[in-house]
Amino acid sequence: MDFRTYLKKYPDKNGRFGQYGGAYLTAELIPAFEEIADAYQTICHSSQFINELRRIRKEFQGRPTPVYHCERLSRAIGNCQIYLKREDLNHTGAHKLNHCMGEGLLAKFMGKKRLIAETGAGQHGVALATAAAFFGLECEIHMGEVDIAKQAPNVTRMKILGAKVVPVTHGLKTLKEAVDSAFDSYAKNYKDSIYCIGSALGPHPFPLMVRDFQAVVGYEAKDQFKEMTGFLPDVVTACVGGGSNAAGMFIPFLEEPVDIIGIEPLGRGEKLGDHAASMKYGEKGVMHGFESIMLKDKNGDPAPVYSIASGLDYPSVGPEHAFLRELGRVDYKVINDEEAMEAFFKLSRYEGIIPAIESSHAVAYAMKKAEEMKQGSILVCLSGRGDKDIDYIVEHYGYGEQYFK
């Protein structure tokens, strides 16, 4: 595979990345998603749209976000140098706003009045509520009751921004059920609404759109890292739930001689129901309108999943990630809850940066890899900040003293 031409080839016109992707939809939703795909194909080449998005990123989001050298953390581990792409400094505190502003601008272009979405950790919900406020649109966010309890600050932020938060009370009451609920609402309201999926997954064109809107992360990081150091990193890594921050971070490095590693949540362990490591333990399947690798129960349905990170507990992964692994270009590893928590506290104490639990999985891998590498450099996408997580963490882990004995 020549990755210099990869973006021109994938996805194909049917939204497929090899055997993955596509759009598996009910008859009533096919025209709705075709309308979105057609609108995106028109607007993504428009200089007016591109210029407006650039203006929003600069003036509203505060982009570009910096690349930061973790000198103290690196020194504590050894000679390998760890760098962070600081998406925690993007407006609203995570990478999610990158695609939400793009989706909001698309909705405006299409004449839609409402944005509908699911959220797990609440970051996508906050980002979409922010976009809705910016563009003067209504916003409806579906969120599992378990996540509402865990992520109270983000629920408050969404409501302050004017969003209607719909609690999801069936099943495990987490991210998968929130997606189900949001899909149901969109099916009833698609004529005046747009469904803004929160990751690089779902039916075509969402894996393509979210990747395109998030690629700004990787393009910035690549240029910034080269400017800082004079060379490319040896390893690029990001956490993977659905895979939006990872898709954005990885795409610009595909054609470069760089190891690319996605990090999934191993949670409490290898038993089904104790993790959300789709790539490690999953198999091919269809859910939520797209084909990818998914965790299945004995009946072939989406399996129950768990992660300490609400934004990672999803039983599948974006189709492009499945394809990139199949091509052998990107590798996927796992980090458990305990490793993520150690990274959370160590980054906080050594660098004064409190990361999201999701991002802590990628930081944990970078710390393990740095110890193994002895020298070289690792660039981590720090996908978000940890404000939303601190109450939950302090209640269950205290202030992290156990990691500094």
UniProtKB/Swiss-Prot annotation:
Its cofactor is pyridoxal 5'-phosphate. Its EC number is 4.2.1.20. The modification N6-(pyridoxal phosphate)lysine is found at K96. SUPFAM superfamilies: Tryptophan synthase beta subunit-like PLP-dependent enzymes. It comes from the Bacteria. InterPro entries: Trp_synth_b_CS (IPR006653), Trp_synth_beta (IPR006654), Trp_synth_beta/beta-like (IPR023026), TrpB-like_PALP (IPR001926), TrpB-like_PALP_sf (IPR036052). Keywords: Amino-acid biosynthesis, Aromatic amino acid biosynthesis, Lyase, Pyridoxal phosphate, Tryptophan biosynthesis. One of its GO terms (cellular component) is cytoplasm. The beta subunit is responsible for the synthesis of L-tryptophan from indole and L-serine. Tetramer of two alpha and two beta chains. Belongs to the TrpB family. This is Tryptophan synthase beta chain. It comes from Clostridium botulinum (strain Eklund 17B / Type B). The gene is trpB.
